[in-house]
Amino acid sequence: VGGGTTLINENELLKTLELCKKLFNIKEISCESDPNHIIPEKLSMFKGIIDRLSCGIQSFDDEILKKIARYNKFGSSKQLQEKISKALGILPIFSLDLIFNFPSQTEEQLLNDLKIAKNLAPQQITTYPLMKSNLTKDNIAKSLGVETKDNEFKYYQIIRNFFKDYQQNNGWSFSLEKNQLNDEYVSSHHEYLGVGSGAFSFLDGELLINAFDLNDYAKMIQEKQNANIAKASFTRKEIIKYIFLTEMFAGKIQIDKFNQTLNCDLEKELFKELLGLKISNAIKKENGALITSEFGQYLFVVLMKDFYTGMDLVRAVFRDSKRLKNKDFINIMKENISSI
């Protein structure tokens, strides 16, 4: 359950999740929240309902928190640590989300973030690389400064080494213990259905996009209309590439299982791509599986980062009501999107 602050109205969320579990065979529920909505009394309402809660902290460095306008909004490093400590142990999995590779972030600042996160001992720690696009790069430069050196690969190596005693779930997620709940649903589910305004679905080789405007979405639902306002169709090879990316992000693909699921021959369909990855020592074939190397794991983090950055550009198009009203058809790949 995404959208940033899904716990902002706990009573409504609880009713919604209980209805979903009643109507559908839902086995696991993961929710997002922020540091202002992890009060123990409120979290206790969701025992037996929410299996994992992800909380965006971004950093424990006060100077960085001030630069990204989170210090006054969510509290200082000390206050954040106190909030998290009280929130732990209520729901099965609490995921603490950090961001690394801020412009001007030092190795010392990164290690301090990692040490604090580890000392708090949440069940899961997720470390996202800073995601920049044409939409956000100017604002990032304005608030955090211009990047003189990109430390992403170096910092990623530090992170992996720091959490070598943890279970690595995928490219950027680490757990105290092995768990089956994947924090990136796109890598564990080839198809998914999005419900709600602005939600994405991927079904039968098509990306479907729901209306972003809440009033438009509500009207469509009330009138029992299809809430999809756009879709994009993918070729068979594009689908194979997409699923290959999302599965390799988790570090390993069983070739026979992949072929059986997609009714394809992976090594034939993506011969050139696999050859390039093998030559660059990003992946290797071992016992019928494709496995990422340390460099390969980072490479797929970069690719997944670009995937999410691209989805942000799609969101920007469909949030622009003027653009939507003036066009009968939108080609996402050809839209000129100005920075904000």
Question: Which role does the model predict for each range below?
Answer:
Residues 201-340:
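Charged, E/D/K/R/S-rich low-complexity terminal regions of large eukaryotic assembly subunits
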